[in-house]
C-alpha cells in the first residue's frame, strides 16, 4: 500500500506539471524538498531545481522576516524584508502575491513587481486587519 507521502508527492507533481508560476513559502519548500528527495540543498538550489525540472516560467518564494526571492530562467531577484513596526501580519502574504501578480500583468519587470510586492506587504503588516486601505503610492 502507498503511504500518505506518496499521495502528496503524486498530487504535487501533477500540479507542478500544470503550472507555469509557483508561489510557495520557505516551510512549503522544506516539505517539497523532503518529499522529492533533496532536503540537503540550500534554498536557491532547490528553487532552481524545481524551476528547471517543471519548466516553470517563475518561482516566487517568501521567507517571512528572511526576505523573498523570485526565480525565472536567467533571473534571480532577492528582496530583504523591511523592518517595520508590526501591528498585524494577517493579509501580508496575500497582499504580496496579489501585488506581485497584478504588477507582472501590468507589464512591470520582475524586479519592479518584487520591490512593490515587498513594500505593500510590509505596509499591510503595520496596519490592523487583513484589508487596510493601500496608500496611493503603492497602487498600480
Where do the protein language model's features map onto the residues?
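Short, glycine/polar-rich helix-capping loops at beta-to-alpha or helix-loop-helix junctions
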Residues: 9-13
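Structural alpha-helical scaffold elements that stabilize or flank donor/cofactor-binding regions
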Residues: 14-15, 52
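Conserved phosphate-binding/catalytic region of the ribokinase-like
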Residues: 36, 40-140
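A generic structural signal for short hydrophobic patches within well-formed alpha-helices
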Residues: 29-32, 68
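Short, small-residue-biased leader/transition segments that mark boundaries at the very start
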Residues: 1-8
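Short secondary-structure boundary segments
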Residues: 26-27, 63
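A short beta-strand/loop micro-motif in the catalytic core of glycosyltransferases
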Residues: 19-26
Amino acid at each position: 500500500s502507498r503511504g500518505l507521502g506518496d499521495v502528496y508527492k503524486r498530487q504535487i507533481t501533477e500540479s507542478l506539471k500544470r503550472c507555469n508560476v509557483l508561489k510557495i513559502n520557505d516551510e512549503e519548500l522544506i516539505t517539497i524538498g523532503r518529499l522529492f528527495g533533496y532536503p540537503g540543498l540550500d534554498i536557491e538550489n532547490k528553487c532552481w531545481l524545481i524551476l528547471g525540472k517543471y519548466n516553470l516560467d517563475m518561482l516566487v518564494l517568501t521567507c517571512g522576516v528572511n526576505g523573498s526571492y523570485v526565480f525565472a530562467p536567467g533571473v534571480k531577484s532577492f528582496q530583504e524584508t523591511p523592518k517595520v513596526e508590526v501591528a498585524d501580519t494577517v493579509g501580508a502574504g496575500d497582499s504580496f502575491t496579489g501585488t506581485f501578480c497584478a504588477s507582472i500583468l501590468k507589464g512591470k519587470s520582475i524586479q519592479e513587481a518584487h520591490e512593490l510586492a515587498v513594500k505593500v506587504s510590509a505596509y499591510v503588516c503595520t496596519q490592523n486587519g487583513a484589508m487596510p486601505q493601500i496608500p496611493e503610492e503603492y497602487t498600480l
